[in-house]
Amino acid sequence: MPLKRNTGLMILMLCTLALWAKSVSAGSSFLSPSQKPQVRQGKGKPPRVGRRDIESFAELFEGPLHQEDKHNTIKAPFEMGITMSEEEFQEYGAVLQKILQDVLGDTATAE
């Protein structure tokens, strides 16, 4: 009798283990069977944005001043907006240009 009982328990444990393994493997992915996981094509680094030379950087400051909103926008590798009056721009424009050239200019020529 104990042999039949042990065999029954062993079969019950195997069935339970098989059902548990199926439920664990079914919950391991959120994709449906018809969907395949996406594979990354390009594993390289994204391209870097290069520095601009001083001549092209100086061209950013040339151009008409917006009279209606008094908002100056400078576009470099990023965009920065400064709001000031025309008198303030006349007074501080050269200083701002020098600071931005020192910050964003080529490090070899800045030193």
From Swiss-Prot:
Q: In which tissues is it expressed?
A: Highest levels in the stomach. Moderate levels in the brain, hypothalamus and intestinal tracts.
Removed propeptide positions: 53-111
Q: Which domain of life is it from?
A: Eukaryota
**InterPro entries linked:** Motilin_assoc, Preproghrelin
What job does this protein perform?
Answer: Ligand for growth hormone secretagogue receptor type 1 (GHSR). Has an appetite-stimulating effect, induces adiposity and stimulates gastric acid secretion. Involved in growth regulation. Induces the release of growth hormone from the pituitary.
**Covalent lipidation (O-octanoyl serine), chain numbering:** S29
Recorded family membership: Belongs to the motilin family.
Q: Does the keyword Repeat apply?
A: no
Attached lipid, kind O-hexanoyl serine, located at: S29
User: Might you report a single GO cellular component term?
Assistant: extracellular space
Keyword annotations? Amidation, Cleavage on pair of basic residues, Hormone, Lipoprotein, Secreted, Signal
Q: According to the UniProt record, where is the region Disordered?
A: 28-51
Location relative to the cell: Secreted
- Pfam families documented for this protein: Motilin_assoc
The PTM Valine amide maps to V49
User: What GO terms in the biological process aspect are recorded for it?
Assistant: G protein-coupled receptor signaling pathway; gastric acid secretion; growth hormone secretion; negative regulation of appetite; negative regulation of inflammatory response; positive regulation of gene expression; positive regulation of growth hormone secretion; positive regulation of superoxide dismutase activity
Protein known as: Ghrelin
Q: Which residues belong to the signal peptide in this entry?
A: 1-26
Q: Which gene encodes it?
A: ghrl
- Could you describe the post-translational modifications of this protein? O-octanoylated by GOAT/MBOAT4. O-octanoylation or O-decanoylation is essential for activity. The O-decanoylated forms differ in the length of the carbon backbone of the carboxylic acid forming an ester bond with Ser-29. The majority of trout ghrelin is Ghrelin-20 modified with unsaturated decanoic acid. Ghrelin-20 and Ghrelin-23 are amidated. In some cases, Gly-50 is retained after dibasic amino acid cleavage, to produce non-amidated Ghrelin-21 and Ghrelin-24.
A molecular-function term among this protein's GO annotations: G protein-coupled receptor binding
Bias (Polar residues) occurs at 28-38
Main localization, broad class = secreted
Which residue numbers carry lipidation of type O-decanoyl serine? S29
Q: Does the UniProt entry include the keyword Lipoprotein? A: yes
